[in-house]
């Protein structure tokens, strides 16, 4: 039970039935200033029931509260502020962190599932910087959801279908070489795709050939299917290299093609409920009552659309996973598409639709412009990550030339810096990409948090930390750190509820700053009776910093 819950229980015992314990808990605040206590209860909602002014109620309640958990209880205007007993609370929190280790802050749920649709690059196209945000936000949400006790199904809804494959087949048959594609798949396939469009300007008949090849693919033609399968496989090999660098994995790679034979099922469901209406020759679902334009399901020529495929995917996932929630980590420009998707699913009578969420995000900017191309070419994510690793290598060589595991540490610091920089910003904000800035060891960066954690681990080694010697006491300077450790579980809850990984990023930055302040005030390694207790606090910080970074998908090297 959290201290907030315990305070709510104490208040409920005094107040009686005017408010439930849950209502009291929701009203309790955390004061912004330390001299206002650790928890504050506003009395406004009791005024009617007690027929008294909130200030008078606060004074009376403060006089009645007597509990060893609180060292001081004060009425401050209409608030009842309590100060936690620092010795008792410090002992409890540090003991809990040391006992629970990585499980500290976790929740337990029985078999509830969350499905996350994230990353979703297009096959045979470069894995550009444009895919970074969906990939790292989705991965962080998965880690946070697992921490909350959910079973998570991470889906990479690959863009592996469409007329572009017909064009690619024409281009490959005309100009491609197998050995070139095998050696540099994405580069060669992109080159062929670009050449197709250049040649098609002179020879428009190529477009018809492209359509014809895609039709062959749709009809299951052996040669077309073999080429499509190969393009998909070589692309995935290249993508998997980037995912490995980022430490991201998926439970399903079912992309657009997987739903080819599942769209009719959705169309049948829509017809059964009389939801399909004709509009200018096309088949649509009318969403006028929902204040939206109609959802286009079938074009005039009978061809299905992106929306039909997404409906088929949603229905398949609802029927297969029976999820409680689903997150679609996709850019904000798709907002209407998802509103329509959820509205159609509601009309079909699916119960879990309220748990389906579009999780949009802002753009990556470079010098105030959208970072999609560099000197007219696509900025490849793998190149950016490699650049970051190289800069991290240089920084480590300057700071610690004899570091034993320098290569692995540079990967964790370099890649971690890119991920952390993305996730320290609220996801709806555009982010400015500045490699030099994000790799600094000071300021609001991933390396700053990692370096703080490495420094804490160094103290444990130098001080010969012995976990069994913790006697539970904590000094006056440690309270800022202890109260930060206490917030970890609530921070995870907030990040999950808002689908906002930046809440975790801000927290690990604040915890790192709080620890560095403590380190500057206290001689941690002084050989006295309290040394092991101080080191127990340091150990608790390393556990929570490491776990907080893990939730973001960032490594925590023990030495830097």
Swiss-Prot record:
It comes from the Bacteria. It holds the Pfam family Arg_tRNA_synt_N. Keywords: Aminoacyl-tRNA synthetase, ATP-binding, Cytoplasm, Ligase, Nucleotide-binding, Protein biosynthesis. HAMAP family: Arg_tRNA_synth. This is Arginine--tRNA ligase. GO terms for cellular component: cytoplasm. InterPro entries: Arg-tRNA-ligase (IPR001278), Arg-tRNA-synth_N (IPR005148), Arg-tRNA-synth_N_sf (IPR036695), ArgRS_core (IPR035684), DALR_anticod-bd (IPR008909), Rossmann-like_a/b/a_fold (IPR014729), tRNAsynth_Ia_anticodon-bd (IPR009080). Its EC number is 6.1.1.19. It is found in: Cytoplasm. One of its GO terms (biological process) is arginyl-tRNA aminoacylation. It catalyses: tRNA(Arg) + L-arginine + ATP = L-arginyl-tRNA(Arg) + AMP + diphosphate. It is an enzyme of class 6 (ligase). A motif ('HIGH' region) lies at residues 121-131. One of its GO terms (molecular function) is ATP binding. The gene is argS. Monomer. Belongs to the class-I aminoacyl-tRNA synthetase family. It comes from Exiguobacterium sibiricum (strain DSM 17290 / CCUG 55495 / CIP 109462 / JCM 13490 / 255-15). The keyword rRNA-binding does not apply.
